[in-house]
């Protein structure tokens, strides 16, 4: 049975003091959580130091929102994997739609980051994939998403998949208040799992974690998580307040 991974992505919100306060509330709120649920928080780079002090030694994993595929060098504004590990980072989000859109990251760059991340002792790498509204309306959803999966996992060995989490996040549902229906999400998640089976093996497909991201909240999370191939959520706005994030967590872990 696959575990449920619930990751809060705080994007460009909170000072380090504010982030640490929210993290402390979450840590306290999940002290006795069901072992089948994994809770993750992803603050800004500048908050990692303070949040690390809160999450260290707890059952809440600490993540980073991106990283360079280089380990050092002339990469102004970027951050290296080793720098993240200094702050106890457990996982890194890669290929988020906002990074693809605003930072110009393409499949080749994202694949380089995946391969670099696998050379470092992160527990997990979250590889995000998803289609735009225009691509969905043209019936290209599966073509786009599965191509991103193939490109993102290029040269990744099956033995490394235990450290890979895939996150399907339809771009049109990110921060818009819109969300895919549970049936729409399940259709894509199932296709992704079948693609993993084709690329690797049935065992790999059965075991890989596939999250859904896109305006997830306390009202829709239970329905989404009830689908066979949805193993968690990458949660934006609803994770910014500890009480709303905890409501989501408690709804799934009950």
Swiss-Prot record:
GO terms for biological process: gluconeogenesis; glyceraldehyde-3-phosphate biosynthetic process; glycerol catabolic process; glycolytic process. Keywords: Cytoplasm, Gluconeogenesis, Glycolysis, Isomerase. It is found in: Cytoplasm. Pfam families: TIM. One of its GO terms (molecular function) is triose-phosphate isomerase activity. Substrate binds at residues 9-11, 175, 215, 236-237. It comes from the Bacteria. InterPro entries: Aldolase_TIM (IPR013785), TIM_sf (IPR035990), TrioseP_Isoase_bac/euk (IPR022896), Triosephosphate_isomerase (IPR000652), Triosephosphate_isomerase_AS (IPR020861). Pathway: Carbohydrate biosynthesis; gluconeogenesis; Carbohydrate degradation; glycolysis; D-glyceraldehyde 3-phosphate from glycerone phosphate: step 1/1. The active site is at residues 96, 169. Belongs to the triosephosphate isomerase family. Homodimer. NCBIfam families: tim (TIGR00419). Involved in the gluconeogenesis. Catalyzes stereospecifically the conversion of dihydroxyacetone phosphate (DHAP) to D-glyceraldehyde-3-phosphate (G3P). This is Triosephosphate isomerase. It comes from Borrelia duttonii (strain Ly).
